[in-house]
Structures are given as C-alpha cells and as structure tokens.
Amino acid sequence: MANSGILRLGNYLLIDRLGEGGMAEVFLAQYSGGEHSVGPQSQVVVKRIKPSLYKSTEFPVFREMFLNEAKLVRSLQHPNLARMYALLEAVDDDLGVKVPFIVGEYIRGVQLWELMRLGTQGFTGKGVPPAIAAFIAREMARGLGHAHAHKDPATGKAQPIIHRDISPENIMVSQDGLVKVIDFGVAKALGGFGPQTRTGIIKGKLAYMAPEQVTQKVVPATDVFGAGIVLHELLTGRRLFGGSNEYLVVSRVLKAEIPRPSSLNPGVPKELDDVTMKALSRDLRGRFADGNAMADALTAVLESVPALSGTTHHTIRDWVRKLTSEAKQVAQGWEEQESGLHVDVQNALAHSVAKGEDVV
C-alpha cells in the first residue's frame, strides 16, 4: 500500500500501511476536509477490517470484534495507552461496502520489538540496560493498570479490561521516550459487553500468553504475565518461550523452568529479579494482581536501587535515538559497501573488455 497510491476512507486519505494482523490493517492517514477533524493531529492512525474479509461468511464476527475493540478503547484515557479519537463509518470506494473504522493517535516512534532487536543485538543474549528495561516495563504496567481499573460508565461497577495480547509488537516507544500500549483488538471486558471467545480459540500470541489463557480464564493478572515475559526478554536478550512449533511453545509456557534474569545477565539487581519472577508466577496467587500492583513494585525498585534511580523519559528518549542512529549508520555502511562492490565489478569488467578478455 505504501507505494501503490493513496486511497480514501471517509474524510481520511490512507497514506501508508503501517501494519496488519489477521483481521485488521492499520494506516497512517491524513484528514482531508469535510466535517470537523476528530483529532488534534493532522496525521492520525486509521484502523479498518481488511477488505479481503468483507465478503467472508465470518465478516459479522469480525465486525462485532472490531466494534467491541472500539467500545473498550474509547473509554480509556491514559498517557501510557494509545488514544482513540472516534469510531466512524464510510463506504469503501472499491467494494461499495459500508465499513466501520477507528481513528486514533499516531505515535511517532518505534515498536518495542524493534528496539529489543537492536538493543539485544538480535536476541543474541545481550540484555538492554536494566534501568531502561525497568522503566519501560513500569510504564507499560501503568497503562495496563488503568485498563484493569476500568469501571462500567453506566453502573460504576468494576469492569476490568484485559488486553490479552501483551507483546513487544503491541508496545510503542515514542521519539520523546513515552511508552504506550497499543492494539486492544482481542481485549475482553470482564462482566461486560463484547463477543465471547469461541471454544477452542486462544487469543493472543502464544509465546507471550499466560498459562491460564489456555483454558480461556483471563483476569487482570493475565496481562501481568505477558508484561513479565517482555521484561524478562528485555533484561536477558533472549526469547523466554521460543519453540519450533506451536505445541512446543505452549508446552514451554505451561511447564518450562523460568530462569531468573540475573542468571543470564549478572547486571540485573536482585530487586528487579524478584519483581520479574513474581510477574511470571504460574500460580495466580503468587503473581501481581494487576498492572497497577506491578507498576508500584517497579516504581519502588527504580527509586530504591542506586543503579536504576534517576531514569526518566529523557533517558528512554536518548536510548531510542542512540539505537536508531546506530542502526541507520550500519545500514548506510552496508549500502556504501554494496555501492563500492558494484563500482569495483564495473571497473573490473571495463578493464577486461579493454584487454579483449572474455567476461562471460
């Protein structure tokens, strides 16, 4: 989509496809006039159901899931959650089908998985600085904690929203060092509205799911386990529950020994070790009850451990800029090497031709 021209959806020009999942696709979009813009930014994110599903017999299910996400997310306002501006409808010009779409905040930044890839040297066992890991995990937990503390607007009763898909792909770090949880596409409100998960379908990425997700019994602590996996991988630079197939991954989630981060990275303080392992308790009774509890524990560690104290958004910002700058330099170096090789080959060919040598 990025190089195939610009499409329109309602009053928004879809400029570039930013990503896609099994059900939906996300675009960088520009407000193009007409009715008043629904967001403070001229550039926004537009999320819609993939057009290939419009004619599917499952489209009503996908539509219900999509509308459920919008209902959940629009009630959440927090600095560590990507903001949703509006749920709108428009006719798809190509197919003539009326479809819903979400307009949300465009975060100028990088997905955490990319920062982890750069910061851990491709998951080769080098963890990111513990202070960076702890701060990112604390901000992530704060965003989740806000969702977990959600109340039904009509009754005021507790109605926790469970993300169910916490992974490095669904965490953004902005250019300013702000950490934001994105994509509540498979979220569930306990005791609230929304489609029920059909029997046999597990929501979320297998390598980041909690053991109880196998039996579809999700609670706020379910998200904590996913956050714990992310924190563990940040600290160690290794996949925690990798595997060559889905069965092996699920088996490891359920039974594999979980090493303390410090056993793989001696630079991890004991206090941060303890928080990580508590988040990864397979027994719900031993795990943080929700995101806020995990965030509070990480705040205490960040404030009490000298090696971690003083970490701020500016620290994260500088780290992100350093990583991305180094990545650009490496890429530029490869391009220069390839360009130099191309020139060398051309010179060699020219020299051979001048001497009358065969070059084929």
Residue ranges of each PLM-predicted region?
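Intrinsically disordered, low-complexity serine/threonine-rich repeat tracts
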Residues: 197-199, 339-340, 352
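Long, low-complexity, intrinsically disordered segments
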Residues: 348-360
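A structural signal for alpha-helix termini and helix-coil/disorder junctions
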Residues: 85, 109, 118, 304, ...
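Conserved ATP-binding/catalytic core of the eukaryotic-like protein kinase fold
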Residues: 1-259
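C-terminal lobe helix-coil module of Hanks-type protein kinase domains
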Residues: 207-347
